[in-house]
Regions:
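Bacterial N-terminal signal peptides that target proteins for export
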Residues: 2-12
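Bacterial N-terminal signal peptides
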Residues: 11-20
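Bacterial Sec-dependent N-terminal signal peptides
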Residues: 19-36
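Structured domain cores in non-transmembrane regions
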Residues: 31-116, 186-188, 197-369
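Mature, soluble, non-transmembrane domains
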Residues: 71-184, 326-451
Length: 451
């Protein structure tokens, strides 16, 4: 799932510019080992064009994959955020290489006013020739799935471009297929694909015939991502659509779509503190006080928390990181980008920091509660410290499905929206959702630097 630029810019607008490091260190002539450090926070997650995808293959009431004939249906369910679109493909089985699809862009799942699209959406389907096999008379050809000797038979099409089927003798789409959307929850949908053909719907030189529909694929994606299945006027991508269009076999395409499917997770600007004793950001199992952690965890806003750290007597240095390396302005950390910050610490000091998991309501990455000791004995530490980082729930807002919830920064109408969490304690994330492995989202490295 790629990140929508409009909503990303709105999120950036809530973020303050980078906050400089503040220090109140006083060595007082003590010969305590001291070192200068640079910390790099890298977003190592992937950027995905598709949020969700899968196959539909088992007819309603059946236990095994199969085509659907007259009266048969496929059903599948998913959740999707506002702004999402649905694409799919299923074979017109009495053909050489035709599919029903919602086109390059898919169809909107939400209306402009934010309400969900429900009901019959068959009128938005079209019948496409994928351009991979020469056409024969529909319902009679020897290289069509019901009659061919094996998969992938038939001559190559002289016109290899994907295009609308132009055959006035065919039944209308709504005489063959019906697609309906039903709301199942606040963000949930059920799709029903029904074969409404009869034994005589397709009129051929051999008489009337039904039109089976094949197993296929579906995908949910943002409006900014289109032409994920095909481009009209261009050849098939070679990723498996041909196998559906010619033989009703979705697995190859489903596998390739799966590689492009997932949740793109930006990280927010954040704060850090160098301290002794108790962690100044939070205590596990206790409510996050009005120190500004809520603003960071819910909206990626860091100024209040940095200001709070300035008043903590056990904090020797603190600051904010807000501008990605190489960027011209403050903003979220997208996949592949880095934040960096530097500080000076001495033996006995520890590091803590916090950065928001932006596709959430109030989650943040931070080290274990005890922080990261910056010296091993008298030697400064160096290297990858990601294994000491955890995903925490601030306990300030009720969790929604990551990347879907309407009260998360990329989709909320304004900061600080969403119902309160009934459990107000800061805790390690432990709910029904999948946030991915920490090491697949964020990488933290620290190194000693010389003046």
């Amino acid at each position: 799932m790629s990140v929508n630029i409009k909503t990303l810019n709105a999120f950036i607008a809530t973020v303050i510019l980078a906050v400089g490091i503040l220090s109140c260190k006083d060595d007082s002539g003590n010969n305590i080992p001291e070192a200068n450090y640079e910390v790099t926070i890298e977003n190592v997650s992937e950027s995905y064009p598709i949020l969700k995808s899968d196959v539909f293959a088992v007819p309603v009431g059946a236990t095994d994959p199969a085509p659907i004939g007259p009266g048969g249906a496929y059903e599948f369910e998913f959740t999707a955020p506002e702004g999402s679109r649905l694409s799919l493909a299923t074979m017109f089985v009495q053909s050489n290489d035709w599919i029903y699809s919602f086109g390059e862009d898919g169809i909107a799942l939400y209306n402009e006013d934010g309400t969900k699209v429900t009901g019959d959406v068959t009128s938005q389907l079209d019948l496409y020739d994928v351009g991979t096999e020469e056409d024969q008379e529909p319902g009679t050809g020897s290289n069509q799935a019901p009659r061919q000797s094996g998969t992938d038979t038939g001559s190559v099409d002289d016109n290899e471009n994907v295009r609308l089927v132009d055959d006035m003798e065919l039944p209308s789409n709504d005489e063959v297929i019906s697609v309906t959307l039903t709301s199942t929850s606040k963000y949930g949908f059920k799709v029903r694909i029904e074969n409404v053909s009869t034994s005589n719907t397709l009129q051929t030189s051999e008489g009337g015939k039904p039109v089976p529909l094949s197993p296929g694929v579906w995908l949910v994606h943002p409006a900014s991502q289109n032409a994920l299945l095909f481009t009209v006027g261009a050849p098939d991508y070679g990723e498996g659509l041909e196998a559906i269009a010619e033989d009703g076999m979705p697995d190859e395409l489903a596998g390739n779509l799966s590689d492009k499917t997932g949740l793109t997770v930006p990280l927010s600007p954040g704060t850090f503190a160098i301290y002794e004793g108790m962690n100044p950001l939070f205590q596990e199992g206790e409510s996050s006080s009005a120190n500004g952690l809520e603003k960071l965890a819910e909206d990626g806003i860091i100024d209040m928390l940095v200001s709070f750290l300035s008043s903590e007597s056990n904090v020797s240095a603190r600051g904010g990181f807000a501008k990605p390396v190489g960027a011209g302005q403050a903003g979220p950390l997208l996949p592949g980008d880095q934040y960096k910050f530097t500080f000076t610490a001495r033996q006995g000091d520890k590091l803590t920091f916090a950065t928001m998991y932006v596709q959430s309501n109030d989650l943040f990455y931070s080290p274990v509660e005890d922080g990261v000791p910056l010296f091993s004995g008298s030697e400064p530490i160096s290297g990858d410290i990601t294994d000491q980082v955890r995903l925490w729930d601030a306990g300030t807002e009720e969790n929604e499905e990551p990347g879907v919830g309407g009260n998360q920064p990329l989709r909320q109408t304004e900061p600080d929206t969403g119902p309160e969490d009934p459990n107000t304690n800061v805790r390690l994330v432990n709910d029904q959702y999948n946030y991915g492995n920490t090491s697949d989202r964020i990488k933290i490295t620290i190194q000693q630097v010389m003046n």
